[in-house]
Every structure is written in C-alpha cells, then in structure tokens.
C-alpha cells in the first residue's frame, strides 16, 4: 500500500466569509490537480475558524479576577487567559507558561486550542465552534462540486502527556470513522486481537501535518491519497476519539 500526501498550495489568506471548499478546488485547478475518489482532505482548523469569523480580539477582552490570578501563576497575558477560560469547560492544570484545559468540545489540550499564530497581532483563533459540522459542510460542497467520494478531517496541532513536541490530531471528521476497531482480527502469529483500536483520523492528521508545517509554509490543506478507508465510512464525527471521563486514568 502506498500513500501520497499532496499539499494544496496557492491558497490565499483566508478571511471571514470565505468558502474553504471553493478555495481548495480553485487552488487545485490552478496547480493542475484534481480530487479523486477516496481522497481525504485534511484542513488546518485555523483557516476554518477564520472563514467562519471565529476570531478573538485580545485587546477587547477585560480579564476577570480568575484570569488575573491564573495569569500571575503562568506568566501569560491576562487577556489570553480570559479567552482560554471562555473556551474551556474545565481548567485541569496550570503552571509556568502552561494551561491545560478541557474545551467545550471535550478536547483536553493546552490553551483550550486557542492559536495566536497565522493571524494579525492582537488576534487569536479558537477552535471552530462545531468542528464536525464544519467538516461536514466542506465535505458536502466538495462532493457536490466534484462528484467524488471523499472524506474531510479538520486538524489541530497539540501536545501529548509525557512526550515532547506537538503532532497533528483530528478535531473534526466527516465521511469516515475516526476509529478502526480491529478487535477479533488475527496478528501475524494467529492470536486474536483483544483491545486494538486504531485512531485512524489522528494518524492521518499527523501525517498531513508534516506537509502543512507549523510556521510560514502556507499549506493549510493536504490531500491524502491511497489510504483504503472504504470500510470506515461513517457520519459519526470525532466523538469516538474522546475518552470518557470515567476511563480517564490521569484525572481520576
């Protein structure tokens, strides 16, 4: 099995009201590329939030007493801390230069997923309000425009407990199941797999992030071609990736 990662280059800076699907198709056409059946399009969450007008002006935020307290403990901008509080359902850990929280979507990550990169000074982008809904809307437009069978993943870059560095993860999914449950299959020695569940959407998002980059690469969307996901067709969204609170061994 061979998989290709194709960066969608030539996309303009995204602004409020832009149609992400249209921008992707236009950039592909300019580059002489077409979408094919089975392609998976991975899109950076930042441009989705920008297109949806989901932008935070830090200068307009008045920090609360809680934000001021956390800012003093972390060394972070009080306005940014207030924005993090607004996007969080729970603050889990704070320390010097870090805040780990659970977002309103159920993701546990740093800074509630708020990103200050690739936007103008004084602005920040939170995660899309409904990442699965955003992915579904983009998927529907792409499929109607091309007639192809596709899937869409909206990705974010997040850190992981006990490991350095950040990797791409899925925060929104449309068209495929984010989990491949392989329980009951046989390994190379004939033993039955008991617990193996593969986080396919996260693995695909991580692969795409190698092409997207984290700085000035200017590649906010990547086509993954050649991955056989026909057995994973689903409309269930990203929720299967989220570990239930009662099974969270880190928070108890």
Curated annotation (Swiss-Prot):
GTP binds at residues 11-14, 45-46, 50, 118, 212-219. It comes from the Archaea. Its EC number is 6.3.2.31, 6.3.2.34. SUPFAM superfamilies: CofE-like (SSF144010). Pfam families: F420_ligase (PF01996). A divalent metal cation 2 binds at residues 157, 214. It catalyses: oxidized coenzyme F420-0 + GTP + L-glutamate = oxidized coenzyme F420-1 + GDP + phosphate + H(+); oxidized coenzyme F420-1 + GTP + L-glutamate = oxidized coenzyme F420-2 + GDP + phosphate + H(+). Its cofactor is Mg(2+); Mn(2+); K(+). GO terms for molecular function: coenzyme F420-0:L-glutamate ligase activity; coenzyme F420-1:gamma-L-glutamate ligase activity; GTP binding; metal ion binding. Binds 2 divalent metal cations per subunit. The ions could be magnesium and/or manganese. Keywords: GTP-binding, Ligase, Magnesium, Manganese, Metal-binding, Nucleotide-binding, Potassium. A divalent metal cation 1 binds at residues 115, 156. GO terms for biological process: F420-0 metabolic process. Pathway: Cofactor biosynthesis; coenzyme F420 biosynthesis. It is an enzyme of class 6 (ligase). Homodimer. Catalyzes the GTP-dependent successive addition of two or more gamma-linked L-glutamates to the L-lactyl phosphodiester of 7,8-didemethyl-8-hydroxy-5-deazariboflavin (F420-0) to form coenzyme F420-0-glutamyl-glutamate (F420-2) or polyglutamated F420 derivatives. PANTHER family: COENZYME F420:L-GLUTAMATE LIGASE (PTHR47917:SF1), PTHR47917. Belongs to the CofE family. This is Coenzyme F420:L-glutamate ligase. The gene is cofE.
